[in-house]
Amino acid sequence: MPRGKGFEFVDNIVGGVIPRNFIPSVEKGVRNTLPDGFLAGYPMVDVRVTVFDGSYHDVDSSDMAFQIAASMGFKACLEKARPIILEPIVAVEVACPDECMGDVIGDLNSRRGKVLGMDSKGNGQVIKAQVPMSEVLKYAPDLRSITSGRGSFEQHFSHYEEAPAPVADKIIKETNAAREAAGAKSGSHAHAHA
């Protein structure tokens, strides 16, 4: 699904295999699963779910039963869907003296940044770039060092992009390690049975 489209629920049920009054329960079950995430526990975005089959029992079917079944079915489908991790990208404007421009651009590139352009301003330059947010969390002291205290920057959220495989793998590994550590601290242990 294209970036920024949110959530789309498509009802392709024919023949009444799921009664119409339970379709909203199916959608709610899927929607309730989105915030929990699948990869590293981050919320899922830009998801299209198509319901095309199901079953119904006169006595045992209920709103809650359809919500639970939809959530479980959605999680099972996610294993085959190849979800990806998106990382936030910020738009950055860095003001620096002319003589520091090359070092600032080199530093932005080393942070996986994309330089979009430059504008002259007084005795310096304003460099416009897009950089993964994780790469500029502690940017101020580095910029001060590069520019001998004569540089400044502004940033704001721009959009999300697919995280490169090594970054995504690192995020997943760190999240799983943190979950295991939290489980060990609480003394709880999860077991799977077949």
Short names for language-model regions:
Residues 1-194:
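Accessory interaction regions appended to the cores of large information-processing enzymes
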